[in-house]
Amino acid sequence: MPATNINIGEPWMWAAFIVFVLAMLALDLFVFGGRKAHRVSVREALSWVIAWCLLALSFAALLWWYLHGAFGADIARQKTLEFLTGYLIEQSLSIDNMFVFVMIFSYFAVPPELQRRVLLYGVLGAIVMRAVMIFAGVWLVSQFEWLLYAFGVFLIITGIKMLVFAEHQPDLDKNPLLRWVRGHMRITSSFHGERFFVLQNGVRWATPMFLVLVLIEASDLMFAVDSIPAIFAVTTDPFIVFTSNIFAIMGLRALYFLLADMADRFHLLKYGLAIVLVFIGGKMVLMPWLHMPVEWSLAVVGGVILSSVLLSLVMTKDAERRTE
C-alpha cells in the first residue's frame, strides 16, 4: 500500500498528542504568566517562537523514529515530510491571520497587556473548530474523492482574489458579525481588564474584549476554510493534518507578539501566500495527471514564502534609505 494511503494515527498517539497540547496550554495559563496581564516583550515572544519551532521539529523526529521501526524507512520518510510540509503551509497561511489580529486590536485599541489572554482563548477556540473541520473534511474526502478537485479550484480562486485584493483593508464598521453582536447585546463603552462580561446594576454587559474574541474566532474560522483544504493537497491522513495544524496554531500567538509591530515590513508576504494557494490548488486539480513528490511541495512553499519575506525586507530598507 502506498505511504500516502496509510493513516498512521493509533489511539495512543492521539491520546498522547492531546495530553501534550493540554499540558502546554496549562503551563502557559498557570505557570508562564498567562494568568497575569502583562505586555509580552520581544524577547519573551522570540523565546516562545523558537520553543514551538523546536517542539514541532522534535515531534517530526519522534514521528520518524517511531514509524521507521513500526512501518519501515519509506513510510517514515513520507509521513515525516508530509508533517513538515503541512506545518509549513499552515504556519505560512496563519501569518495572514496575524495581520488580521493586528487590525482587530488596532480597531478596538486593545492595550498590549490585555492581548495575551484574548489570544489564548482564541487558540483554545481555534483548536476545537479546526478539529471538527479536519475530521469532517477527512470524512467527506474519503466518501467523495471529487471534493479534492473542488477544494483545488476553491484554493485557486482564493489565491487569485488574494492577489487582486492584497492591498485591500476591510472596514470593521461594516462587518456583519460585529454589527449583529452590537445590535443584540449590551456592550460597555470601555474595557474592564481581561473580563469578557461584567454586571452593572444587576444586568450582565459584554465588554469590548468579548467583541475582540468573537472577531478573532471568526477570522480563524475563515482562514481555516483556506488552510485545511490546502493541506489535503499533501495528505489526507487525519493525524498528520491535525498535528501540523495544532503546532501552527500554538505558535501563532507568539509569532503575533514578535512580528505585530513589524507587520508593515512584510507587505509582499500576502502575494507570496496567494502564489502558494494557487500552486497548491493547481496541484490538487492536476493530481490525476501530475504527481508531485512531497519534497517538491515543501521546497516550493518554503521558497516562495522565504523569497516574499526577504524581498519585502529589501524593498522596505530601500524605501527607508530614500526617505532619509
Q: What does each of the following model-derived ranges do?
A:
Residues 1-324:
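Multi-pass alpha-helical transmembrane bundle typical of ion/small-solute transporters
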